[in-house]
């Protein structure tokens, strides 16, 4: 699955290169990084989330550069899971075969759907503000580095890959291949390096702030 394609540029190759560079920056900042893929392979959505749980991740980031023909989408955008999608996600993710992967390894076998839903809601009460804080840190960092940003740089959507209840999760659209401006930027190694550095710095800042605020969120 090559993802989006435009003028010979494929999303899968572009984002893999971007992710590998971001990993190197983060490692230099003393941050442990686990990649869902580090080569040209396809990883199912549910397996990406499972990798994050197995690694006991503190932040899950999904990188994209899509093609949207309608609306003239352009500029970097960071998504968190929407309230509407969260309700739907709870309904589907509370299914028995997924429960052990959803709530920090907790075994919900024998729990009814109502109990599972309550546990998911409790997990999201802690995770949602942390995801939003990560989105704010990322958009601020990318904007300060020159962006360019979408008119509404923080949005909510029901992306399946963001449905983990217990790990702060964001999806970053670095830009849109359907935008001539974004495509030009995404092809530019200097621009990509600037954005990689900005995102890495933003993650490091979020990590430090999150460590201080997490105990307060749990109260």
Where are these regions (language model features)?
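Active-site-proximal helix/loop segments of hydrolytic enzymes
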Residues: 6-219
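Gly-rich Lys/Arg/Thr-decorated short loops/hinges at beta-loop-alpha junctions or inter-strand turns
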Residues: 2-3
């Amino acid at each position: 699955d090559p993802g989006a394609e435009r003028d010979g540029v494929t999303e899968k190759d572009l984002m893999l290169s971007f992710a590998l560079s971001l990993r190197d920056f983060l490692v230099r900042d003393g941050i442990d990084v686990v990649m869902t893929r580090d080569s040209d392979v396809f990883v199912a959505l549910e397996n990406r989330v499972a990798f994050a749980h197995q690694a006991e991740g503190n932040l899950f980031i999904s990188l994209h550069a899509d093609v949207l023909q309608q609306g003239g989408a352009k500029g970097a955008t960071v998504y968190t899971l929407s309230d509407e999608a969260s309700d739907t996600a709870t309904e589907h993710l509370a299914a028995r075969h997924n429960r052990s992967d959803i709530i920090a390894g907790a075994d919900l076998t024998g729990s009814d759907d109502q109990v599972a839903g309550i546990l998911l809601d409790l997990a999201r009460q802690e995770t949602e503000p942390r995801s939003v804080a990560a989105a704010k840190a990322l958009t601020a960092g990318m904007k300060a580095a020159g962006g360019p940003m979408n008119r509404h740089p923080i949005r909510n959507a029901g992306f399946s890959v963001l449905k983990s209840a217990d790990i702060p999760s964001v999806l970053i659209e670095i830009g849109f291949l359907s935008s001539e401006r974004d495509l030009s930027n995404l092809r530019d190694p200097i621009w990509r390096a600037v954005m990689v550095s900005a995102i890495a710095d933003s993650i490091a800042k979020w990590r430090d702030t999150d460590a201080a605020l997490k105990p307060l969120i749990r109260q």
